Amino acid sequence: MAKTLAEKVWDAHVVRKGDGEGANAQPDLLYIDLHLVHEVTSPQAFEGLRLAGRPLRRPDLTIATEDHNTPTLDIDKPIADLTSRTQIQTLRNNCKEFGVRLHSLGDAEQGIVHVVGPQLGLTQPGMTVVCGDSHTSTHGAFGALAMGIGTSEVEHVMATQTLSLKPFKTMAINVEGTLRPGVSAKDIILAVIAKIGTGGGQGYVLEYRGSAIRALSMEARMTICNMSIEAGARAGLVAPDQTTYDYMYGRPHAPQGAEWDAAVEYWNTLRTDDDATFDVEVDLDADTLEPFVTWGTNPGQGVSLSSRVPSPEDFGDENAKAAAERALQYMGLEAGTPMKEIRVDTVFLGSCTNSRMEDLRAAADIIRGRTKDPNIRMLVVPGSARVRLEAEAEGLDKVFKDFGAEWRFAGCSMCLGMNPDQLEVGERCASTSNRNFEGRQGKGGRTHLVSPVVAAATAVRGTLSSPSDLDPAPESAAVSSSAA
């Protein structure tokens, strides 16, 4: 029987098949290959094990890092916020008690959990990967079935190394063509979400396919899979190929020698069969895609940067119309305003969506030799300590500092209002993160989701801008279309 990639990975991990079929089917029990843990969703799960007198089933398949609540300045000093300090200390205590490897603040491998896993070679094709975090779908870029789970499910995986789930439907996102300069993976996924809506992927696993996807680097593919959840999907995948293997080869936890050869042979089978069918297929033309930006308060409220803020009257559905009215009020925008005339206060380059080396390089290429708008505050937060060190070895930190940006230590930072990096009430931010909900970056903060190169161009002009809007710099740099 012909199968999609998601079905192949699923079937390879079924420990027990659920009884019944169709709407009456009971959940399957799946084995979990990798469990990633952080300080926010793990305390109750560890406490559940402790109260039940249960051991952690597979400490060797459980990896923890500190990221959500961590400061990105003065990391050698005590954490000021009591709640954040307590959560981080609790994670440290739990990991010590249950024998979990932990990458703490100051550790050479500390960073955002969805950056650390791939860079260490922990994430591999064909795996099942879970984490108590929505954006676990990032790891699907490797052809893994990667899902965010709740705290009760975190405890279940800790206790049994399994997860009870009903099979998902499958959706193909076909992206054909060639991206133009200044257009990136972030623009692809924002366009996809705008097309199918924030609930369009509910109940589905998305597989990203087509020539435009194949042309992307691994870091760009991670950007796309990262935001699958913003379309309502449980997971998003890209079939592994030579690009995947080149990225993984030689990483600390990747197979070596004969084991590598055997792994690649198996990984090459992880692709959707030619005669397999998806429940739904969606097409996107990469040739015509422009830089994309959100105007509202969910990731589906996005338009091309060259267009205008839409009017609620543009929406036929009454719920969408009402949502647009609320969004415009919260964002302090008027319908019909050109997107490129929207002035921002802060630019944030970071998050598990866009904080990897390619993202930093792409942004640095834009700002090199240019001057930051004096009214803009720009935060650059590498996704991991390793990314930070690599960027510094290339001199990127100097590029950002000379531009007037703040160069920070690794962490989730301004992606979410759980650490010191937050917007003030009414502040507007061009952000490379993944969510623009009300208050996401701080109470009353206003967020526009953008790509790294749009973020950089915005920092130069002070208004939402693309690289093509900039005058030539003294030191010009080409913008790679594969940059995330």
Swiss-Prot record:
**Source taxon at top rank:** Bacteria
What EC identifiers does the entry list?
Answer: 4.2.1.33
Q: Which PROSITE patterns is this protein grouped with?
A: ACONITASE_1, ACONITASE_2
Question: Which principal EC class is assigned to this enzyme?
Answer: lyase
PANTHER family hit by this protein: 3-ISOPROPYLMALATE DEHYDRATASE, HOMOACONITASE, MITOCHONDRIAL-RELATED
Summary of the function given for this chain in its UniProt record = Catalyzes the isomerization between 2-isopropylmalate and 3-isopropylmalate, via the formation of 2-isopropylmaleate.
This chain's protein is named: 3-isopropylmalate dehydratase large subunit
